[in-house]
């Protein structure tokens, strides 16, 4: 049977997920649920703090709250479906559901790539052009940059996901993944998918390599500025904020590069599942910890919110 772009609403896919390791499904369910709850709690905590505490009404925390919201949405677009599949025999997803999931996973992933570039630019201006920071990072401009990240992500995803579902999928409907994503869907095709694979490589290069190059360029300039600093306190502050952002960048870009910067035909399905599991489950849960563990401003805001700060 052939599934085309005009498939009926009764069509469905079977998400194989981790069914090759049935003995691990219970363990995976518990571990993934814990990480998912950590993601929800940590990122909601940052969003609430950034909104209610006036001390955090700065460009850095505005972008951080946007990143937290992106992480929440990105994780929620795939993990609840995975948890349901791990705990029950029903592992299907409707054709429409698969389209929607693919669209949001791509959109939110691309938006996060762009937003991480914006955050690195914010740090560059703060360190390299501190006297012009309030002018260059005006609240209106910050809102425009954040909105641009979302618009770019959702626009490019609409084009790319449409191109993916135009490919005729035939035979079985077994998606060897735990969510609908491009390489896994292309493996179901009964036609030559080299054009789609090339498109995926080009899109990945544009929205993975170019943002990464821009981020590294910004931090190269920051490193030169830091080396010329005389103040030890200033050095420590820069290393704390920039080091946290670089760690988040590494946790996001390294697995994404391993996942998308090679043709789907050369990518091991099992390897791809665990790489995807890392950047959809582990990374979003660690980001709040990375940004807050040694951050005095966030700790102070948390104390004020919880009423733990005494007058001085």
UniProtKB/Swiss-Prot annotation:
Database matches in SUPFAM superfamilies: Family A G protein-coupled receptor-like (SSF81321)
Extracellular face residues: 1-26, 81-101, 160-196, 261-273
Glycosylation sites: 6
Record membrane topology: Multi-pass membrane protein
Result when mutating residue 218 to T: In allele 6M1-6*02 and allele 6M1-6*03
Effect recorded for residue 74 to Y: In allele 6M1-6*02 and allele 6M1-6*03
Keywords assigned by UniProt, alphabetized: Cell membrane, Disulfide bond, G-protein coupled receptor, Glycoprotein, Membrane, Olfaction, Receptor, Sensory transduction, Transducer, Transmembrane, Transmembrane helix
Single GO cellular component term: plasma membrane
GO biological process, one term: detection of chemical stimulus involved in sensory perception of smell
GO MF annotation terms: G protein-coupled receptor activity; olfactory receptor activity
Residue ranges annotated as Cytoplasmic topological domain: 51-58, 122-140, 221-237, 294-312
Cystine bridges: 98-190
Transmembrane domains' residue ranges: 27-50, 59-80, 102-121, 141-159, 197-220, 238-260, 274-293
Protein's cellular compartments: Cell membrane
Stored InterPro entries: GPCR_Rhodpsn, GPCR_Rhodpsn_7TM, Olfact_rcpt
Alphabetical list of PANTHER family matching this protein: OLFACTORY RECEPTOR
Assigned protein family: Belongs to the G-protein coupled receptor 1 family.
Task performed by this protein: Odorant receptor.
Name of the protein in its database record: Olfactory receptor 2J2
Organism: Homo sapiens
